[in-house]
Amino acid sequence: TDRDNLEQYWNKFVEDVKCSGGGGADWGERTKFLNVFFEYADISQTISGITPSHLAYSSFVGYCNDERVNIGVLYDGWSDLNLIQRLWVMYHEFGHDVYKYEHSTDPADIMYPSSTRSDIDLNDFIRAKDRMFRRSFPGIRYISCPQTD
């Protein structure tokens, strides 16, 4: 896995959904505009100790438009993560963008807001992403998007 190729995480997610059975549509076919990108702290932010308060985010343009995926990732934080943590972060953001999930209150869920814990292992990830695909985690809530005509 190439740590710096964010598109590969999208491709893994799309294939994982297809293989899971019941995970949803073929997001690769459905998504017409894929924008997954790194953000970098500028020199003045670095010197002052100020950095963005998020590691990654999806945006309105993505989660309220079924044809778009728009996810930004803070490179400085990303580069410190192991593979399982990177998968967890990206699946979390795809959960917002593709499934329109809000955050969960259960730390065992991918949709929990702080998902870069060091105690996450491969089995934790598999269980959490399977629950996400099946839409079967407690307190599931969806992002509200405006109706379009």
How should each PLM-predicted stretch be described?
Residues 8-63:
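Auxiliary, metal-adjacent structural segments of Zn-dependent hydrolase domains
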Residues 38, 66-69, 84, 97:
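Post-signal/leader-peptide non-cytosolic segments of secretory proteins
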Residues 27-29, 64, 79-85:
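Short, surface-exposed loop and linker segments with low hydrophobicity and enrichment for Pro/Ser/Thr
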Residues 1-3, 9, 54-72, 78-80, ...:
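Metalloprotease/metallohydrolase-associated module, dominated by Zn2+-dependent proteases
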Residues 4, 38-39, 81-82:
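Short, surface-exposed alpha-helical recognition segments that flank or form part
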Residues 36-43, 74-76, 93, 112-116:
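Active-site-proximal beta-strand/loop segments in catalytic clefts of secreted hydrolases
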Residues 86-87, 109:
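Residue-level detector of short, conserved catalytic/binding motifs and their immediate flanks
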Residues 87-101:
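Active-site recognition of the HExxH zinc-binding catalytic motif
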